Amino acid sequence: MQQTAKLYSFIGKKHPEFILQNKKIPISPDITQPIGKVLQRLPRLVLPHQVLCYNALPSHFLINFMSNHTSWSSKIGFVLAAAGSAIGLGAIWKFPYTAGTNGGAVFFLLFLIFTILVALPVQLAEFYIGRTGGKNAVDSFRVLRPGTQWLWVGRMGVAACFILLSFYSVVGGWVLNYVVHSFTGAIHAGADFEALFGTTISNPAGSLSYQALFMLITVWVVKGGISDGIEKANRYLMPGLFILFIALAIRSLTLPGAMEGVSFLLKPNWSYFKADTMITALGQAFFALSIGVSAMITYASYLGKDQDMFRSGHTIMWMNLLVSLLAGLVIFPAVFAFGFEPSQGPGLIFIVLPAVFMKMPFGTVLFAVFMLLVVFATLTSAFSMLETVIASTIRQDERKRKKHTWLIGTAIFIVGIPSALSFGIWSEFKVFGKTIFDLWDYLISAVIMPIGALSVSIFTAWIQDKQSVLKDAGSGSTVPRAVLLLWLNTLRYLAPIAIIIVFINSLGIL
């Protein structure tokens, strides 16, 4: 005899509907008996007052459990948070010194082309996986391809974010330390900035203290959740970053001789147009959009199906490119105006820029402002890394967020201690000829990020059903089908080839 069962729940303003997945619950055939008395033990998240009535089965009935899946409170909230994740030190620190050592304008042009043609499609593929799966980086793959091993791509991304944040927080600590230096008088005209940087990174107590402070700020924001924590912080930090950048760019462009720096950034010297520059620009494009480590999958999982992920992706890309351009317009005109070389390498913002700013009127204040915006960019990236790890552990149970955030944040700090000490008392300890900091950096940027990006491309374009991808990715978007097909074909052919080239080059084979 066919029987049916109905279970009704009333949902409070802040209490979502809870439906238990993969649990068989015995339900009494006596419909006059309240379910709270029928079940010997209620499911953990089902409250008795939420259950109204039912028509029951004499046997077990399968009930799905839908947990409290939070989301962005607005479209701009997602865009600002994802842009903050992508911008980070890649745009403000890595882009200027990489452009400076690779010819400036030629590198910037190649970086622009590769970002649009290759990196953006992969970022959109991560958006597709996260939004369609609707869960954390691991479970989104499990939802889209149940019973397969593709979830290991998500697990790899989560592990990458954990490791990445462990040494990224070390650099974040340096930046915070320099902000303090700016206000305590350590940075002044005539100071030995190379010696100051060496002391900053090699002092164990100082390095660990500022690393801990950086992680404390990150944990404090992420424990607040998506809308009340990460989104709210980015609503202030990202506009602040752009305002400070524009102000500093205007000041830099008014310096005598500044146009030489502008020409370096915007007027191509085609002698730099060579294979090495192209591969480096391609690698920077992937690094710049924060792809390959599942951060964008996690952020997109909080995105509604009615939101245009293509428009959001393009907005995020152009914001990232704008910050890279502004970073160049702040740094290169000032560097050329005071006779410094643009090809200074990673020490550019810690060694060269202090000397440059000290030659300006109110240089100490301007440098403090610059380091403050670097702090903003560093933190917004750190939020996404920690959230990727947290989301995979709480699995949409927001009640666990605070506890897990504190525990995981502490674990990340502890794992990061060897990286912090690798510039000082542990500088002689090396694995495969690399310090702990350099080893983690190489593992993430040269191995995991390319493999992650390649896996996402193959999964979206080759493993998933083509029509399903086009339907789900195009949901909420006005993008023509022809553009969707172009995006999918780019993921099929162009993106994998480009990623493999970057991967081989990063391994030192090319």
Description of each model-found segment:
Residues 71-82, 107-110, 149-162, 210-212, ...:
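Select transmembrane alpha-helical segments in multipass membrane proteins
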Residues 61-93, 120-127, 131-144, 148-155, ...:
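Membrane-interface "cap" regions at the ends of multi-pass membrane proteins
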Residues 69, 97-102, 137-156, 169-227, ...:
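Inter-helical loop and helix-membrane interface segments of multi-pass membrane transporters/permeases
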Residues 77-114, 294-300, 310-314, 318-319, ...:
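Transmembrane helix-boundary motif of multi-pass solute transporters/channels
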Residues 77-79, 85, 208-209, 319-325, ...:
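Loop-to-transmembrane helix boundary motifs in multi-pass membrane proteins
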Residues 67-72, 231, 235-379, 403-404:
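Membrane-embedded translocation segments of transport machinery
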Residues 98-102, 149-164, 198, 213-237, ...:
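Membrane-water interface regions at transmembrane-helix termini and the short interhelical loops
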Residues 208, 435-458, 480-510:
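A generic transmembrane alpha-helix motif of multi-pass inner-membrane proteins
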